[in-house]
Amino acid sequence: MASTSPEPSTAAAVAETGCSVQIRRLEATDHEKGFVALLSQLSACPDLTASEFAACFADLAALGDDHVILVAEDPAAPESRILATGCLFVERKFLRGGGKVGHVEDVVVDAAARGRGLGLRVVRRLVEIAKEAGCYKVILDCTPELRAYYAKCGFVEKGVQMAIYF
């Protein structure tokens, strides 16, 4: 999870949104800031010990810019917690001359922080990163209830998702 340019500076973010929430890459210390608990608001997510989190973080960090996890955090808050997150996985293809596709996954905003535009900011930044990485498209799967939300993020409905779970 190598560094890319972060979202606009805190001052710019405050001017744009009226809050000091920053969008940045996941850090190894985010376990203590409730990252795993936030993911459990999206889907079943067993609690990880600090060492399990560190091992998973190291594995994902080794993928570099092909696997980017962003988080939203308000460093001005008395108790800094992760308020939102989203992930971008970049897939290399033989199609389109070895093109790349960005997959947006695991987007969730803490229930207490919803309605503040944090998910939109995370998703838009993930799309920017995909574009910077040379992806020819960005795709995601969502429930029917979230179609309108992702349409606000610029996505259009295409196709049908099918899955096999193990």
Curated annotation (Swiss-Prot):
Residues given in the record as acetyl-CoA binding sites: 115-120, 150-152
GO biological process: UDP-N-acetylglucosamine biosynthetic process
Pfam families reported in the protein's UniProt record: Acetyltransf_1
Known EC number: 2.3.1.4
Gene3D superfamilies: 3.40.630.30
Keyword Acyltransferase tagged: yes
Pathway as given in its UniProt record: Nucleotide-sugar biosynthesis; UDP-N-acetyl-alpha-D-glucosamine biosynthesis; N-acetyl-alpha-D-glucosamine 1-phosphate from alpha-D-glucosamine 6-phosphate (route I): step 1/2
Disulfide-bonded cysteines: none
Keywords: Acyltransferase, Endoplasmic reticulum, Membrane, Transferase
Membrane association type: Peripheral membrane protein
Annotated residues for binding of substrate: 43, 93-96, 105-107, 136-137
Catalytic activity: D-glucosamine 6-phosphate + acetyl-CoA = N-acetyl-D-glucosamine 6-phosphate + CoA + H(+)
Gene Ontology CC terms: endoplasmic reticulum membrane
Family: Belongs to the acetyltransferase family. GNA1 subfamily.
Assembly, per entry: Homodimer.
This protein's name: Probable glucosamine 6-phosphate N-acetyltransferase 2
